[in-house]
Amino acid sequence: MISRIKSFKNALNYDKMNCIEIILRRNDLMSTSFENKATNRGVITFTISQDKIKPALDKAFNKIKKDLNAPGFRKGHMPRPVFNQKFGEEVLYEDALNIVLPEAYEAAVTELGLDVVAQPKIDVVSMEKGKEWTLSAEVVTKPEVKLGDYKNLVVEVDASKEVSDEDVDAKIERERQNLAELIIKDGEAAQGDTVVIDFVGSVDGVEFDGGKGDNFSLELGSGQFIPGFEDQLVGAKAGDEVEVNVTFPESYQAEDLAGKAAKFMTTIHEVKTKEVPELDDELAKDIDEDVDTLEDLKVKYRKELEAAQETAYDDAVEGAAIELAVANAEIVDLPEEMIHEEVNRSVNEFMGNMQRQGISPEMYFQLTGTTQEDLHNQYSAEADKRVKTNLVIEAIAKAEGFEATDSEIEQEINDLATEYNMPADQVRSLLSADMLKHDIVMKKAVEVITSTASVK
C-alpha cells in the first residue's frame, strides 16, 4: 500500500496538500467513550460510520480528479474504478478524514457532554476499507470551579466621584495649550521651547545607525531623546553648534549601544516658543463653538468630568468586586493550554492591529527591541487573570441558572448594531446565537456581583 500511495502522490503532487497526519494502530472498535487520564484531561474514542465515510471519499476524489494524469485518459477524466485499481482507495483517506472529522468530533463531544477548552490531538485507531473508522482524541476539559462568596461583597476602591475646580481648570488648560502656536524666538532656548536641529551621533568617533537627523523638531523637556541630551541644548541660540555628550542607558533597546558614551554634534537652526492664547471668553468659543463664555465652558466641562468620573468610579467598583469574587473561588488545576490559547489570541489580535497600521511583526520587534517571546511574556499575566475571571463568571451564571431569552438576544443584536453602526442582520451573520447567549448570561452574572457589592 505504501508504494501505491507514493506513486499516487507523485502523480498528484500530493506532498503540497495540507492534510491531517494519520497515526495507525490496531485496536478493537469502540463506541463513543471517554477515559479520564488526569484532572481535566482524558481521551475520547469515537467512530465514524460508512454512511458518513462514503460521501467524504467521493468529495475527496472529486477534489483531486481534475489534477490526475494516467495513460489512456485525458487529464481530469480518470474513472473512479480505474483510480481505485491503480492507486487504491486508501490514498483518499486523509482527505476524506479532513472532511468528515470536524462534525464527527463535535458530535462525540456533545454526546459525552464534555466542555473541551483546547485543540484536541487526534489519532486514528482503526481505518479499514468498508468498515467504520475509529479515532481517539486527547482533550483538555474545562476545570471545576468551587465558588466562594460573590454576593454582598465589600470592596475598597482608589477612586472618587468628586470633581474639583482644579480638575476643570486643568482640562481647560490642556485645551489652551493645544491651541498654542509656535513662533520664532530671538534668543536662548529654554525648557518647553522647540528647537529645529541637525545632529550626528558617534561612539568612539564612529557614527552609528539611527544616530543622524536633519531638521528635527525637538521640544526641550519632552523626554524624546535619551536622558541628558535635551538639557544640554537649553541656552543655545539659532546658528549655534553644540557638542552634546551623553551615555546610553544600560537598558537601551539597541544592545550594541547600551551603556556606551556617545557624542552628538548638533546644529541649531531655529528656536521656537509657544504663544498661548489668553484665558478669556474668546478662548472658550475657540475651544467649543457651543459656548459663549469661559464660565459656560467651565459648567459644561464640569458636567462632562462628573459623568466620566462617575463611570470611572463604577468601573473601579465593578473591577474590585469581580476581582474579589475570583479570589474567593477555587479553580481546580487550571490547564496551561487555556492560558496559552488566551496569550496566542491576545498576541494575534495585537499583531493584527499593528499590521493594519502598516507595521509588520518584523518591523515591530526591530523598533521595540523585543522578541516574540517577550510579547508572549507580556500578555501571560493578563491572560491568566482573564481566563480565571471568565471561568468564575461562567460558574456564577450556571449556579444562578441564568438563561438568555429570545427578546434579550434580539435586544443584544440591536444594541451591538447601534454601537458599531451596522445593520442588525450583519450582526446576526457575524455572531452565533450561542455567542450572544453566552455574552448575555455573563452580563447577568457580573450584575449579580456588582449590584450587591458595597464600598468600604
UniProtKB/Swiss-Prot annotation:
Report the GO terms under cellular component: cytoplasm
Q: Which reaction does it catalyse?
A: [protein]-peptidylproline (omega=180) = [protein]-peptidylproline (omega=0)
Please provide the record's keywords in A-Z order: Cell cycle, Cell division, Chaperone, Cytoplasm, Isomerase, Rotamase
The places in or outside the cell where this protein is found are: Cytoplasm
Show the SUPFAM superfamilies listed in the entry: FKBP-like, Triger factor/SurA peptide-binding domain-like, Trigger factor ribosome-binding domain
- Output the GO biological process annotations, alphabetical, semicolon-separated: 'de novo' cotranslational protein folding; cell division; chaperone-mediated protein folding; protein transport; protein unfolding
InterPro entries documented for this protein: PPIase_dom_sf, PPIase_FKBP_dom, Trig_fac, Trigger_fac_C, Trigger_fac_C_sf, Trigger_fac_ribosome-bd_bac, Trigger_fac_ribosome-bd_sf, Trigger_fact/SurA_dom_sf
Organism superkingdom: Bacteria
State the Gene3D superfamilies in the record.
3.10.50.40, Trigger factor ribosome-binding domain (3.30.70.1050), Trigger factor, C-terminal domain (1.10.3120.10)
What is a single Pfam family found in this protein's UniProt entry? FKBP_C
- EC class name: isomerase
Known role = Involved in protein export. Acts as a chaperone by maintaining the newly synthesized protein in an open conformation. Functions as a peptidyl-prolyl cis-trans isomerase.
Q: What is the official name of this protein in its record?
A: Trigger factor
